[in-house]
Amino acid sequence: MFKKSKLLSAAIFSAASLLAFNGQADTMGTPKISAMSILNGLENPWDMAFTKKGDMFFTEKCKGFSVKTKKGAVNKLYGMKGTSGYNSKGDDLFCEGQAGMLGIAVDPNFKKNRRIYVASASTKHRGSGCKDNFDVCNGNIIMRFEVSKDMKSVSNRTDIVTDIQYKPFESDHPFGGPGAHNGNRLRFGPEGYLWATTGDRHKGDIPQHPTLLGGNVLRIDTDGK
């Protein structure tokens, strides 16, 4: 009888503890998430990068990159071919499939050097490979810009990486059109290097190639080396 009573008491205590724990789980430590719109009317927004002051640079895949300043002004800085309204543009930049103007990153020393970095599809450095060689088509680049102090324009475009592979032809993969599996995310690491992800272009052997840059994670300095 003693053993049964002891077991029953233990069971009741355990059940009560479990109910109390579940009640706490519902009310304690549960984050409340809210959302608000800060920009409207964007077309395929792809990436964002912030200055330490809170200015937000962002890309639109088939248009260009802009900045929303801490004070709320939105300035369209650099567009691709066929766009309008940007302070300046590059006619070699284009949008196709999953490719376009994609990754963007702010230099850790932005306050001093005013530099940002942008990855995009480009015709500038393509060469003949994009016409007759599926493997060797250098159609993605990483650019470096300097932003004006009033945040209204960029200058001194420098293409610091020019030989990232691009998919120029249709293939038999699902969604296998030109520009597929393109990659191009940019981020700075804690040691000051710029990290870039590149796409495999639906070619499983590309990441294993000893010299081609597709299907890899690249670590480069701010000059592209």
Region roles according to the model:
Residues 25-205:
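Acidic, Gly/Ser/Thr-rich repeat motifs that build Ca2+-stabilized beta-propeller blades
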Residues 178, 208-213:
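Short, contiguous, pocket-lining structural segments
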Residues 223-225:
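Short, intrinsically disordered, charge-balanced linker/junction segments flanking boundaries
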Residues 1-10:
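Bacterial N-terminal signal peptides that target proteins for export
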